[in-house]
């Protein structure tokens, strides 16, 4: 049986995430970092769900990814900080999807589903009456400490998110997703160049200095 490109991406993503090594973390180091992080303190003071809210705020301030009334699909949305920002800055129909439980967000539709399963595509279609102006993805697999492994895993999730973007964006729409430093490359970069007019990479100030994450912003989707 010959698999389609879409089927290969779904299968590859699951295999990459399943076989990667588990990371050994230091809870003490993590707690100390949280205490000293100004964006953590700001998020707590302003009632944000997480410091990640400031990443998408800064991305939007630089690249204007939201327009008033835009509909937004937020992939891997938990705990919901990007969803809240999307509602504040766009305010259109907003669908947040994650395999994890999420507390409700006023005016957002929340779907608990595994994006690695093709059934999620059908669920999104049932919940949305039209395609989306913006597709977001802050998805990242837990890191292992092994740079090449972490890059491969994050690249796999970015490819998965791009697949959803191509399926669900309106003509002229915008895709914003987390990638690792070095940006997009290989098949993912070719896919984005084929489907979008402009592609930029940006590391917002809210991204921790020691983090390898950066973001790809692809605008002008060609339906």
Regions from the PLM with identified roles:
Residues 181-223:
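Class I S-adenosyl-L-methionine
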Residues 155-171:
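A short glycine-rich, Lys/Arg-flanked "PGG" loop and its adjoining helix->strand segment in the class I
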Residues 2-68:
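Class I SAM-dependent methyltransferase Rossmann-like catalytic core
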Residues 79-90:
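Conserved SAM-binding loop of SAM-dependent methyltransferases across substrates and taxa
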Residues 70, 92, 173:
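Glycine-centered, small-residue-biased loops immediately flanking beta-strands
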Residues 172-179:
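Conserved beta-strand signature within the Rossmann-like core of class I S-adenosyl-L-methionine
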Residues 68-78:
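Conserved class I S-adenosyl-L-methionine
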Residues 97-144:
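S-adenosyl-L-methionine
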